[in-house]
Amino acid sequence: MESINYQILKRSEKKLLGLFFDYFQHVIKMHETLNKLLCEADVTKREKLIQAIYEMEDFSNKSEFKLINESIWAISKNSPLTNHLRLTITIIMCSRDLERICDYANNLTKFVKHYQHLDVSIFSKLVNLHKSVLNNLKQTFASLQDKEKPLTIQFENVTKILTEFEQQYRVVLTEYYDKVKDEKLSDRIFLIDLILSVKHIERINDYCYNIIKAFLFVKNPEVFN
């Protein structure tokens, strides 16, 4: 009986992880589309990319609800053991992180739409920062699927990426802050919006860190003792 229950739990885990990784791939695709938008000079193409991202945001909300519902159902139905319960709760927590990462893509898209009358070159520093977090998103996804390399190493890598990004991010922020002091009011409003967009990008890296940390805790809880 115990063996049968274990098999049921493992099947449930596999299903939840499958849904989670499908959702994660959608998040990456959404941010790849956003990066294209930040680089796109053609207004008509920009409009199509904006619409695509809005639709992806809607799909993201539905994916999160589905994943949470499946997770709650798995808990109520299967009476999971400690390790299985820990994984299921982690999937719920990380699905919230993925949803927030999509929210930031949506917010950045609204920013681009509001200022799409401006030359696309004005977003150049934003593009570079966003490419950095997009790469981190992809690395985080790959790390969670890599069964050979210990997550402790991936955790160290993400921590290093965050430190390097922090330096790059602060340089850009300082430059924008300095400009705010000197510009006229209309330009100042744009620069403040630009600074907020930089902050959105920074938060994406934080959520990548949270996701790796959460899955590391599932496998090696003693790391955080």
Curated annotation (Swiss-Prot):
Coiled coil: none annotated. InterPro entries: P_transport_PhoU, PhoU-like_sf, PhoU_dom. Pfam families: PhoU (PF01895). One of its GO terms (biological process) is negative regulation of phosphate metabolic process. SUPFAM superfamilies: PhoU-like. This is Uncharacterized protein MG409 homolog.
